[in-house]
From Swiss-Prot:
Mg(2+) binds at D150, N179. Pathway: Metabolic intermediate biosynthesis; 1-deoxy-D-xylulose 5-phosphate biosynthesis; 1-deoxy-D-xylulose 5-phosphate from D-glyceraldehyde 3-phosphate and pyruvate: step 1/1. Its cofactor is Mg(2+); thiamine diphosphate. Gene3D superfamilies: 3.40.50.920, 3.40.50.970. CDD domains: TPP_DXS (cd02007), TPP_PYR_DXS_TK_like (cd07033). The lineage of its organism: Bacteria, Pseudomonadati, Chlorobiota, Chlorobiia, Chlorobiales. One of its GO terms (molecular function) is 1-deoxy-D-xylulose-5-phosphate synthase activity. This is 1-deoxy-D-xylulose-5-phosphate synthase. GO terms for biological process: 1-deoxy-D-xylulose 5-phosphate biosynthetic process; isopentenyl diphosphate biosynthetic process, methylerythritol 4-phosphate pathway; terpenoid biosynthetic process; thiamine biosynthetic process. Keywords: Isoprene biosynthesis, Magnesium, Metal-binding, Thiamine biosynthesis, Thiamine pyrophosphate, Transferase. It comes from Chlorobaculum tepidum (strain ATCC 49652 / DSM 12025 / NBRC 103806 / TLS) (Chlorobium tepidum). It holds the Pfam family Transket_pyr. Its EC number is 2.2.1.7.
C-alpha cells in the first residue's frame, strides 16, 4: 500500500497540501519522494539522475508557489517526476512511461500543473516569456517560473530568450539547476556572505530605496550616479559569483545556494516572489542525489533504459536472451576503426556522447572529437566549416534533435554540397520516451533537400558498410538513419564492403506482390512475407537501402513481376519513402496498384516497441492482414 510505504507523501493530493506542513515534515516528504523515484525507475526505467537532483527544489517550489495558477515550466522535463508526484499523480506513477499511462515528460493534456509540454532542451525560458507576456496583456498577476539545467543553458535558444526577457522587464523567475556538469560554482566565505546578502530583504529594500532616490535627482546626475552604483555592485558580484553575465542580460542574479537545503530554498523562493522583474536563482544540486551509484557515475545514470536492482545498482536483464550489439555501439566502434586509419575523420556530438556511442571516439581520439553542447544548429555549421577545411566530419545526432538544425543543414551544408555525414540515431519509434523523442519525420524532412544522399541500413553490418560508403564513395552530404537499441544479430565482418550507391537488394524472390522495405522495415517485410506465403501468396521482398537516390531499376523489376507493390517504412506516411515510390510508379507504371505503410499523420504515444508497432499497424500480423485485403483488389 502506498500509504504504508509513503505515509506523508500519500497525504499530498495537490501542492496545497504541502502548505500545511512544517519544515521538518517537508524534509520528510522530500525523502519519501526520493525513495519513490528510485523505486519507480528501478521498475519502469526512465530519467533518473535529474529527478533525484531536484527533489528538495521541487518540494520548496510547490510549497512557496501556487500551482497551477502560478506557471511552473520544467526545461527538457527529465527532472519532472517529483513534480508529477506532488501534483496528484502519485497513484498513477506506476504507469509512468507505460502504454496508455503517464508520459515521461510534462504534458499539458495530462495535468493543469504541467504548464508547458517539454522534452527537448533549452525551451523553458522562451515558453516562460510567452506565458508572462500573455499574463501581462490579460492583466493577470500569476507568477511564471522556468527551471533550466546548466546543460540546457548551452543551447542558444535559452540565451535568445534571456536577452529578450531582460529587455521586457517582465516578472519571470529563472531557476538555474546547476548540477555541476557544465558550470563550476565559485567557493569561499565571501561568496557565501554575498549569497546571503543578495537574498536579504533589508538589502533588497535598501537597494530599491537607493534606486528610487537616485531617480528623483536631476536626470543627468541621477543616471550618472545610478551607473556608478551599478558598476560597483556588478564588480563585487563578478569577482565572487558567476552572476555578472546574467545581470548583463537584464536579470537580477541570486545565489548560488544549496539546492538540497530546504530552509534556504524556501527563504530564497519567498524572496523571489516579492520581486517583479526578471531574476535568476542559481541553485547547486547533485545529480543522482541519494542513490550512491548515480552520484558516483552521473553520465551513466542520467537515465535507466530498463530495470535495476536497488541494492546493487546493477541492471536487471531478461533471462535467456543473449545480448545483441546495439546499432549505436556498432556505429561508434566502426567510426573509431576508420578514424584510427584516417586522420581526416572527425566526430561531433551535441552533448550526447554516450547516447550516440561517440564516447568511444572521445576515449580513442579525443583531439578529433567535438562535444559542442546542446547546440545542434552550431554543430551542423561547425561540421560545414570542418568540411571546408578538408576534414570528414561525422555528426552523430538523434533524429528528433536534428530537426532543430534544419536551416543549417540546408543552407550551410547541402547548398554548398559539403561532405558532411549525418549519423541519425533513434530513427523511427523509440518506445517509452514517446512523441517528443520518436524519430518520425527525418525521411520526410530530408527528402526535399537537394544534393543529399539518404540511406538506411537493414542490419548492423549494413550500418558499418554504409558508414564506409558515406565517407569514401560519396562527395556531398550524406544521411544514414538507424534505430535505437539492439540490432538483428547479423554477423559482423571486420572488413568494410562498399554499398552500391542508389541500389537496393532482393531479400526474397517472388512474383505476386512486392514488399519494398527501407531500413529495418525490410526485416519486417520478410516477417510479413512468411505470413503471406502461408496464406498462398509468393511475395517479392526488397531492401531498398536508399531513399535518395531511389533505386528505380528494382521498382521497374517489381512492377514487371507483380501486380501489387507495398512500401513499408518507420517514418511518417507523408513525404517519405512511400511517397517517392508512389510518385515514380504514377509516371512510370500507372497501372500498378501500390499501397504504403508507415507512421500515421499523428503524434505516436509512448509504450513498448511491440505495443507501438501494433498501434500503428507496423507489426507483421497487421501488415499481412492489410496486404491480403489489398491483394484481393485485382487491377
Amino acid at each position: 500500500m502506498i500509504s504504508q510505504a509513503y505515509p506523508l507523501l500519500s497525504s499530498i493530493h495537490s501542492p496545497a497540501d504541502l502548505k500545511k506542513l512544517s519544515l521538518h515534515e517537508l524534509e520528510l516528504v522530500a525523502a519519501e519522494c526520493r525513495k519513490k523515484v528510485i523505486e519507480l525507475v528501478s521498475q519502469n526505467g526512465g530519467h533518473f539522475g535529474s529527478s533525484l537532483g531536484v527533489v528538495e527544489l521541487t518540494v520548496a517550489l510547490h510549497y512557496v508557489y501556487q500551482s497551477p495558477t502560478d506557471r511552473i515550466i520544467w526545461d527538457v522535463g527529465h527532472q519532472a517526476y517529483v513534480h508529477k508526484i506532488l501534483t496528484g499523480r502519485l497513484a498513477q506513477m506506476e504507469t509512468n512511461r507505460r502504454y496508455h499511462g503517464l508520459a515521461g515528460f510534462p504534458k499539458r493534456s495530462e495535468s493543469p500543473h504541467d504548464a508547458f509540454g517539454t522534452g527537448h532542451a533549452s525551451t523553458s525560458i522562451s515558453a516562460a516569456a510567452g506565458l508572462a507576456a500573455a499574463r501581462d496583456l490579460a492583466g493577470r498577476k500569476e507568477k511564471v517560473v522556468a527551471i533550466i539545467g546548466d546543460g540546457s543553458l548551452t543551447g542558444g535558444m535559452a540565451f535568445e530568450a534571456m536577452n529578450h526577457l531582460g529587455d521586457t522587464k517582465s516578472d519571470v523567475l529563472v531557476i538555474l539547476n546547476d548540477n555541476q556538469m557544465a558550470i563550476s560554482p565559485s567557493t569561499g566565505g565571501l561568496k557565501n556572505y554575498l549569497v546571503n546578502l543578495t537574498l536579504n530583504k533589508t538589502y533588497n529594500r535598501l537597494r530599491k530605496f537607493v534606486w528610487d532616490s537616485l531617480s528623483l535627482l536631476h536626470n543627468e546626475i541621477g543616471e550618472t550616479a545610478k551607473t556608478a552604483v551599478h558598476r560597483i555592485e556588478d564588480g563585487i558580484k563578478a569577482a565572487f559569483t558567476p552572476g555578472a553575465y546574467f545581470e548583463a542580460l537584464g536579470f537580477r542574479y541570486f545565489g548560488p545556494i544549496d539546492g538540497h537545503n530546504m530552509e534556504q530554498l524556501i527563504k530564497a523562493l519567498r524572496e523571489m516572489r516579492q520581486l517583479h522583474h526578471p531574476k535568476l536563482l542559481h541553485v547547486i544540486t547533485t545529480k543522482g542525489k541519494g542513490f550512491k551509484p548515480a552520484e558516483e557515475n552521473q553520465p551513466k545514470w542520467h537515465a535507466s533504459v530498463g530495470g535495476f536492482d536497488i541494492e546493487t545498482g546493477k541492471n536487471v536483464k531478461a533471462p535467456g536472451k543473449p545480448a545483441k550489439p546495439k546499432y549505436q555501439e556498432v556505429f561508434g566502434e566502426a567510426l573509431v576503426e576508420l578514424a584510427l586509419k584516417d586522420p581526416t575523420i572527425t566526430a561531433i556530438t551535441a552533448a550526447m556522447p554516450s547516447g550516440t556511442s561517440l564516447d568511444l571516439f572521445q576515449q580513442a581520439i579525443p583531439s578529433r572529437c567535438f562535444d559542442v553542447g546542446i547546440a545542434e544548429q552550431h554543430a551542423v555549421t561547425f561540421a560545414a566549416g570542418l568540411a571546408c577545411g578538408g576534414f570528414k566530419p561525422v555528426f552523430a545526432v538523434y533524429s528528433t534533435f536534428l530537426q532543430r538544425a534544419y536551416d543549417q543543414l540546408i543552407h550551410d551544408v547541402a547548398l554548398q554540397n559539403l561532405h558532411v555525414v549525418f549519423a541519425i540515431d533513434r530513427a523511427g519509434l523509440v518506445g517509452e520516451d514517446g512523441p517528443t523523442h520518436h524519430g518520425a519525420f527525418d525521411l520526410s524532412y530530408l527528402n526535399v533537400v537537394p544534393n543529399l544522399t539518404i540511406m538506411a541500413p537493414g542490419d548492423e553490418q549494413e550500418l558499418r558498410n554504409m558508414l564506409y560508403t558515406a565517407l569514401y564513395d560519396i562527395k556531398g552530404p550524406v544521411a544514414i538513419r538507424y534505430p535505437r537499441g539492439s540490432g538483428s544479430g547479423a554477423t559482423l565482418h571486420k572488413e568494410f564492403t562498399p554499398v552500391p550507391v542508389g541500389r537496393g537488394r532482393i531479400l526474397r524472390d517472388g512474383k505476386s506482390v512486392a514488399l519494398l522495405g527501407i531500413g529495418t522495415m525490410s526485416n519486417r517485410a520478410l516477417e510479413t512475407a512468411a505470413l503471406l506465403e502461408a496464406a498462398g501468396l509468393d511475395p517479392l521482398v526488397c531492401d531498398m537501402r536508399f531513399l535518395k537516390p531511389l533505386d528505380t531499376e528494382i521498382i521497374d523489376m517489381a512492377a514487371s513481376r507483380c501486380t501489387h507493390i507495398v512500401t513499408i517504412e518507420e517514418n511518417s506516411i507523408i513525404g517519405g519513402f512511400g511517397s517517392n515510390v508512389v510518385n515514380y510508379l504514377h509516371h512510370a507504371h500507372p497501372g500498378i496498384k501500390c499501397i504504403s505503410f508507415g507512421l500515421p499523420d499523428a503524434f505516436v504515444t509512448h509504450g513498448s516497441m511491440d505495443e507501438l508497432y501494433r498501434e500503428v499497424g507496423l507489426d507483421a500480423e497487421s501488415l499481412s492482414g492489410k496486404i491480403l485485403e489489398f491483394y484481393k483488389d485485382k487491377p
